[in-house]
């Protein structure tokens, strides 16, 4: 279910502010979004996988907290990120 190293590196390269930036909210949200999308595809085939569903809900909550933090600290960055990732908010 996890992202491959190449997928992670591509996401980090796209959203990082400076080289080696893996901790900024944009990078963290983008990685969580990719993991969430991958897990959602998993649940199409495995409807009864409740253990993984718990992990999915945890990731969604973590992403929500990061997005709330970013919205409070820098609204234009928040708006650009959700538009780029295609999130509904």
Swiss-Prot record:
InterPro entries: Ribosomal_uS15, Ribosomal_uS15_bac-type, uS15_NS1_RNA-bd_sf
Keyword RNA-binding in annotation: yes
A Pfam family per the record: Ribosomal_S15
Record-level GO BP terms: translation
Coiled-coil stretches: none
CDD domains hit by this protein: Ribosomal_S15p_S13e
Gene3D superfamilies named among the record's database cross-references: 6.10.250.3130, S15/NS1, RNA-binding
Subunit structure: Part of the 30S ribosomal subunit. Forms a bridge to the 50S subunit in the 70S ribosome, contacting the 23S rRNA.
Name the UniProt record assigns to this protein: Small ribosomal subunit protein uS15
Organism: Cellvibrio japonicus (strain Ueda107) (Pseudomonas fluorescens subsp. cellulosa)
